[in-house]
């Protein structure tokens, strides 16, 4: 995979990014001289829709300048690849499923609650903040250990 563009990843399901959010993202990317690569769903503001294998997704994340997402996978891939990111929180409305509970739990466990927002305009300030990935990696390691132990006990019966 050889990518020469400087890009940000927009990882969101199709239809979840509003017209106003798409316009803001497009303006933001232009200001930062970045292309917008959409993964997870086609987006109006994307310069490119990336349709790739699960194995290639992490390579795209690893090479991104930053990430905007409203998904669990977009958030955790950003963490794993040590990218600056913002997670957009969607509230549940009527029969539509929000992401607040799942993403709040993940990011609070990793002490990254400051990466969440409900307002697209917050992305620039959030993505400019440094992340102590050494600390985050230690927290992630501890949570993995607990999860593995839980699974081991359940499998042993």
Please tell me what each predicted stretch does:
Residues 4-157:
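Active-site anion-handling motifs in enzyme catalytic cores
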């Amino acid at each position: 995979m050889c990518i020469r563009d400087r890009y940000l990843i927009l990882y969101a399901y199709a239809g979840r990014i509003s017209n106003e959010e798409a316009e803001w993202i497009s303006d933001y990317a232009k200001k930062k001289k970045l292309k917008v690569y959409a993964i997870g769903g086609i987006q109006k503001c994307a310069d490119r829709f990336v349709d790739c294998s699960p194995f290639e997704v992490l390579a795209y994340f690893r090479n991104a300048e930053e990430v905007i997402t409203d998904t669990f996978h977009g958030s955790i891939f950003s963490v794993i690849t040590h990218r600056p990111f913002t997670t957009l929180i969607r509230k549940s409305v009527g029969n539509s499923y929000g992401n607040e509970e799942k993403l709040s739990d993940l990011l609070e466990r990793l002490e990254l609650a400051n990466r969440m927002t409900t307002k697209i305009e917050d992305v620039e300030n959030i993505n400019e903040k440094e992340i102590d990935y050494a600390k985050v990696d230690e927290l992630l390691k501890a949570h993995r250990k607990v999860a593995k132990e839980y699974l081991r006990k359940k499998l042993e019966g």
